[in-house]
Each structure stands twice: as structure tokens, then as C-alpha cells.
Amino acid sequence: MASYNRTRRIAEEIRKVVSTMLINGVKDPRITSMVSVTDVEVTNDLRYAYVYVSILGGDEESTLTGLKSAGGYIRREVGKNIKLRYIPEIVFKLDDSIEKGMYMDSLIKRVNEKNAQQNEDENYDE
């Protein structure tokens, strides 16, 4: 249990550092300001940190390529800010949960509109 709490705390610290780096420290033009870190998962051995990013607007593939090329720099900054024996290898992954959530929201709105229209039609027929 203590190991889980430690990895969770480390993941949260990595998320903070990477988020700050994306706002202030990375100068790659492929990385837009519309990139946000949604989650970080760290393996139990602390060798890998999977950083899930959400990219709103813009070219997702180009942005991911920019993030991967800046990975070494970001890893070095993580090492400066978090004191660990091993600095995890940063692996960026696209998190499309926001897009999926927006799609589900649009489906729910469409169903609600259909139900409202059917209720109006039924009330009109009476």
C-alpha cells in the first residue's frame, strides 16, 4: 500500500513539473499552448512515466512528435525538480477522453432533443 501511495505522489509531482515545462520551458513550435497534461502513470519500478496529454486544436501527430523530441529535456528537468535515484523515462501518450466525452455529450443532447420532440408531438396529438 505504501508503494502505491509513493508512486501516486511521484506521478502527481511529475505531472506538475511537465505541465509547467509545457507552459514555460519548451520552445518547440510544434507544441502549442493547447496541450494539457491530463494524467501521469508511473510504473512500480519508477523506470517509466506515461504522460497522457490532451491536444485541443492543431495537429496531434506533429505535437506528439514535438513532445517526444523534447522528452530528454523534460526528463532532465524532472530530475532537477524531483529527487529520485532513477529518473523515469517520459513516454507521451495521447489522451482522447475529452473528445470522447464531448462526443458522448452530443449524443445525450441529441437523444434529449428527440425525447422532447416526441413529448411535444404526443401532447399536440391529445
Curated annotation (Swiss-Prot):
PROSITE patterns: RBFA (PS01319). Its main location: cytoplasm. It is found in: Cytoplasm. It comes from the Bacteria. One of its GO terms (molecular function) is ribosomal small subunit binding. One of its GO terms (biological process) is maturation of SSU-rRNA. InterPro entries: KH_dom-like_a/b, RbfA, RbfA_dom_sf, Ribosome-bd_factorA_CS. GO terms for cellular component: cytosol. Keywords: Cytoplasm, Ribosome biogenesis. It holds the Pfam family RBFA. Belongs to the RbfA family. One of several proteins that assist in the late maturation steps of the functional core of the 30S ribosomal subunit. Associates with free 30S ribosomal subunits (but not with 30S subunits that are part of 70S ribosomes or polysomes). Required for efficient processing of 16S rRNA. May interact with the 5'-terminal helix region of 16S rRNA. Monomer. Binds 30S ribosomal subunits, but not 50S ribosomal subunits or 70S ribosomes. This is Ribosome-binding factor A. The gene is rbfA.
